[in-house]
Amino acid sequence: MASTADIKNGIVINIDGQLWSVIEFQHVKPGKGGAFVRTKLKNVTTGKTVDRTYNAGAKIDITNVDRRDYQYLYQDGADFVFMDTSDYDQITIPGPIVGDAANFMLENQNVTVALHEGSPLYVELPASVVLEITYTEPGLQGDRSTGGTKPATVQTGYQIQVPLFLETGTKVRVDTRTGDYLGRVND
């Protein structure tokens, strides 16, 4: 058993038989009273997010999670097929486990899969990916002076908000955690 001093972003803890990933944590030492740790946890199976507070020094059960490099191969119905880059074994991961990561995955892209006792928990992507805009309305001449945005569909089928001056065929960098446009990529 570990203590609250060992809490870090990304670790997985076991609470009442369910696995929770730490999204955020903050050690708080108020002027009056004892210190405590405020956490934001995400259930790795259901995706539910909760806030939980622990007294400083409380015991927690940190679960060992094996993170392995995989390559995304293709989508098979609602499932996604990945190949282990070390031994070339293929695994099929159901869509609900892949979750929102599917919006940003391209074929042959390297990802990290978190495994617990051989079962996939979730798919981790890089912080940002480069995607090509496959469709967006043309920007009007007078719209360039304003700081507005317009919807654009990227090659995975996901829709993002982009500045008005971008056109179909432009490559853009997208934040995989929020889905926000980060910038244009020049080839």
Swiss-Prot record:
UniProt pathway: Protein biosynthesis; polypeptide chain elongation
Cross-referenced CDD domains: S1_EF-P_repeat_1, S1_EF-P_repeat_2
SMART domains in the record: EFP (SM01185), Elong-fact-P_C (SM00841)
PROSITE patterns listed in its UniProt record: EFP
Disulphide-bonded residues: none
Domain of life assignment: Bacteria
UniProt keywords, alphabetically: Cytoplasm, Elongation factor, Protein biosynthesis
GO function terms (MF aspect): translation elongation factor activity
InterPro entries registered for this protein in UniProt: Elong-fact-P_C (IPR015365), NA-bd_OB-fold (IPR012340), Rib_uL2_dom2 (IPR014722), Transl_elong_fac_P/YeiP (IPR020599), Transl_elong_KOW-like (IPR013185), Transl_elong_P/YeiP_cen (IPR001059), Transl_elong_P/YeiP_CS (IPR013852), Transl_elongation_fac_P (IPR011768)
UniProt cross-references to Gene3D superfamilies, sorted A to Z: 2.30.30.30, Nucleic acid-binding proteins (2.40.50.140)
GO (cellular component) term, any one: cytoplasm
Subcellular locations according to the entry: Cytoplasm
Biological process annotations from GO: peptide biosynthetic process
Annotated function: Involved in peptide bond synthesis. Stimulates efficient translation and peptide-bond synthesis on native or reconstituted 70S ribosomes in vitro. Probably functions indirectly by altering the affinity of the ribosome for aminoacyl-tRNA, thus increasing their reactivity as acceptors for peptidyl transferase.
Family: Belongs to the elongation factor P family.
Protein name: Elongation factor P
Species the sequence originates in: Leifsonia xyli subsp. xyli (strain CTCB07)
Recorded name of the encoding gene: efp
